Amino acid sequence: VQTCALPILTEIGMENSVTLFTHSDFGRTLTSNGDGSDHAWGGVQLVAGGAVQGGRFYGSYPLLEIGSTWEIGGGRIIPTVSADQYAATLASWFGVADPDLSKVAPSIGNFDTRNLGFMV
């Protein structure tokens, strides 16, 4: 992004108007099921662009150990940030009004924090 997309976006004056991101609620377990690892929740997301408050980690990095307070059994780790919180933050930046966020992020009402604050 730093060496490919950003110079082009800067050249055309769009560096603060374009945001690149990955989004998934898919993860893997810490343990093997004999054929690999099973499906689980959580993962690392990437957000890049001129309007991103970068250089920070949003959420809490869990202790990746069986039996830790983050692990709920079967090697499954509970994420500290919901995919819907992530989506709602981006949707707000795109201009979606707060009352409409549940159309984009259906479970956003389950969280005290709707906007994670990573967009300017």
Task: Locate each region found by the language model.
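Hydrophobic, well-ordered secondary-structure elements that form the walls
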Residues: 25, 45, 90
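Short, small-residue-biased leader/transition segments that mark boundaries at the very start
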Residues: 2-6
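Substrate-binding rim/cap in mid-to-C-terminal beta-strand-loop elements of soluble/periplasmic
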Residues: 42-74
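Short, solvent-exposed loop/turn and secondary-structure capping segments
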Residues: 32-35, 57-58, 102
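Membrane-interface soluble catalytic domains
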Residues: 10-15, 65-120
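Short, well-ordered loop/turn and helix-capping segments at boundaries between secondary-structure elements
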Residues: 32, 51-53, 92, 96
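Metal-dependent active-site segment of extracytoplasmic phospho-/sulfohydrolases and closely related
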Residues: 9-34
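Extracellular/periplasmic catalytic domains that process cell-envelope and extracellular macromolecules
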Residues: 13-16, 37-41, 51
